């Protein structure tokens, strides 16, 4: 290239930053002229940074010395300006960042050119620019360039001199002078930054102060209005009552005679008001006076500051103008010649080369464009400055505004820079919100116009940055960014008031103008050497330009690169680089905007937001329908199974906690629950059959769970979309039973209440679907809430027994979760119901059983319940089916216990067996009826407490059923259909059922035998009870169908768990907690004669039983007296009801003890649990069973007696508060049957309370009945 690398560097720096210096000096200088009044911010000084370049170096030095004070000011101003760019950056988000900072770095890097004479100005400008970031480099470069004292610079200068024919190294004084000038300018930059920072703070303060002042004015304006209102109202009052305030004077009446109390009071009050007004007036007046005086003094101070600042600005501008004129004075003549001589500086070589370099520099600046984009606010001013004075040109040539070379300080420059400064100040002040106040009025006007226009049009290019000529290189770059036309527009907009002065020069600053400006040089430089040098400089500049952006690249270019727009190669031609890069830069800005808009994170956030909003809408929209439908379907089922009455009460809190947990867990829990609800409502009902079929394995839970898994996603979306309180409320409403659902607690005694039906107690067929739904609910909790739920895994994978265990476990887990503490029990029961639903699966079978039994058993067991119940006991496996139907948690437990005994066919076998066994069992029941009756009395008391227990007893006839009933009992105990039973039952019955269910499997066989014999003995009297139980029987019909007879026959077993609690409650609890079989054995072993002993023993063991069979007790707690009566009648009536109603009491008791005592106890325990869970169904069954048992008067009388008492106790247990109240009705119903044994009724009722079905028949004796009532309270307490 002919130019040494140093030359290239110099040329590059000159071409890039040097041109910028030339341009910017003019821009700054014009601003500087205006600076005194309208350029409060020494942005002009920044521009004036270039001024030094124009003057000779020694002159620059002298100027530096002369302007030491002004230089300090300039430094402060420079700092302020630097701060101002920062402040403006804060104020102008678009990148008001002053090019002062970044551009200077570029300049320092770019401009190491050596300027001769007037070109020194360019050098100065460059140094001033780079001084901020690269002050050392800049100065050294300036020294090298101007003085070439550095070896490399000198070598390059010498080389360039030789190459350029007579290049002259800069004299030392010149270099030193320029060094001093640059030192001054650099320090001035930091000072300007400080000034800008202060101004920004002041503008911010003003922005805060103005609204406060406005508020102050408003306050006093309002106060004045109130005072005026008081005054006006007083005037109106005086006009109205002027003559009526005193007694009317009448002739002849002494004035003193009139009482003056009212007048005195009024006068006193008025005086107080006057004093108050004086105080208020003093306060307001003093405050207003102080405020006005303070504001006036502040205004005076501000005016003084303004005048002082203007004077300083004038001095500073004068010094800068002199500095510039001195630097440019020597170079006037040499300006034409020296460019060739001092090709090193790149100035002499530059007319065309510099012009092209200028464009190249613009390309480079475009490279900086992204950076400058930040500074665009200042860019406009800089651009205009560069356009107008673009060639540093000190454009004495092109800037003919005021003075060709002094022009930098001359008015044109002043106009340009001043608007820039004004804009800068305005940008700070406007963004500060008080800027106008901060800046002088004229400058405010100029600033406001340029700033507003610029700020609105090109806030990035606000004159602020321009005025911060400190960033000359950036301004050049930005100018390059902007097309000349844009620059002109910017300049015109920026300088509206004064800019128009600069406008003429700015059009000159257009590329054509610059070319014309450079043309003088270019003409002189047209010689071959000059042209060659120009080419070399272009190349070097292009390289240099490429190199320059790199240092700033980490800061500035990063943004550009991020913008995605690549700056065109700097080597581009002037026009090409100028137009293209600018557009590209803009496109880059657009790209940046697009990139932000298209930011995947933002898009994801927006998508999530929209999705959440949509989910919220869907959730709320579906919330109503879901709540309506799922409340009708799922809520009843969920409420009944998942949320026992206690659960219903707890449900709101648990639902909330679940909802919170689900929120933390991505709404997995709640959505699953919601899904469960929907599954209950629709998938569960729809999938009842599939779930039933799969209930053994708990596929029901899984199956429904899958459905819920589908719904849960939607639900989760909805919930996530609306994790708000409304959604929580919706969830609470969904999870918590509706009033109808809650009714089961109160309506448990009602047996056939729709609430019970919803709970699955009154209406067994719905219950099964509900339980199926519940099973899905459990599976749902397993799926989504299953985070810690064991049930979820066990349900899908476990076999029937395992499933029931998993149900039990899940019940515990759910209970532990407290989110579904009641539901877990019931939900577990519900899964058992799911198992019942599948008779094959025992739980599904149970649901099918109960469904089949529900119609069949209700029909058959109402007439044959007493008989069917023994058979139901015989089919304990179906009991699992019944429990699954009867209650969620019991079926689970039962499914575990009866897993092997569960048979899908058993559900229907239950129905058939209930009918057939009701018929067939009488003979076998003859033996067990004594036991059964003993238990029946005990159970009768229990069934009175928990008539549900009686239906369960009916369900117990078959071993499978008894198991099913055991879980069902557990379920019902869990299902807190009896309010206490549900509360206590769920907790107790679940453990009990769990513990007892394995043993109950054994009991199932024994209990089935007992139930078979018991239905025989219990069946006759049970018809009446079934009639009574029939009301509860519908819900329990599956259980009740087979249990009716069994319940009544088995009622002792069922009640046995219930009434045995007192006598055999230890066994019951042992059975459930320790060894149900032992309880069963003890129950069978106990004879009616033992009844008293057992009752005593049960009293002793009630403590144990209360612990083990708290659920049973809670289930059967209702009527102690009724239990005694029911038990005695049951023990007596079961033998009578059964083949030998009269004398079988002890015989069945013995038989019961021997064969089915344990089973009956287990069954009765199971049923007790189930009854506790679902007392109402039993109550209804008890009524229907009574009616059916009434077919056999003796048996009916006794069994009805027992079951009436049991119903009384059951209903009382269900109603807990009305055990005795219901007893009288039961006593009345029993009175016809057991008129002679009304006393027995009282004891059977107590026996029902104590009878857990686990105690020996003897415990069912009247003697037992007495302790049983006590044990019942214990159980209640325990539960």
Curated annotation (Swiss-Prot):
Compartments where found: Cell projection, Cilium, Photoreceptor outer segment; Photoreceptor inner segment
InterPro entries hit by this protein: PCARE (IPR029352)
Biased composition (Acidic residues): 477-491, 804-818
Composition bias type Low complexity, residue spans: 1076-1090
N-myristoyl glycine: lipidated positions: 2
Chain intervals with Polar residues compositional bias: 886-901, 913-925, 955-965, 1047-1062, 1226-1241
Segments for region (Disordered): 101-168, 380-598, 802-821, 860-1107, 1127-1279
Keywords: Cell projection, Cilium, Lipoprotein, Myristate, Palmitate, Sensory transduction, Vision
Any one Gene Ontology cellular component term annotated for this protein: cilium
Disruption phenotype: Deficient mice develop severe early-onset retinal degeneration associated with a disorganized outer segment, progressive thinning of the outer nuclear layer, microglia activation and non-responsive to light by 8 weeks of age.
Record bears the keyword Lipoprotein: yes
BP-aspect Gene Ontology terms: detection of light stimulus involved in visual perception; photoreceptor cell outer segment organization; protein localization to photoreceptor outer segment
Keyword Lipoprotein: yes
S-palmitoyl cysteine-type lipidated residues: 3
Coiled coil: none
Function: Plays an essential role for normal photoreceptor cell maintenance and vision.
Stored PANTHER family: PHOTORECEPTOR CILIUM ACTIN REGULATOR
Name by which UniProt lists this protein: Photoreceptor cilium actin regulator
Provenance organism: Mus musculus (Mouse)
Chain's gene name: Pcare
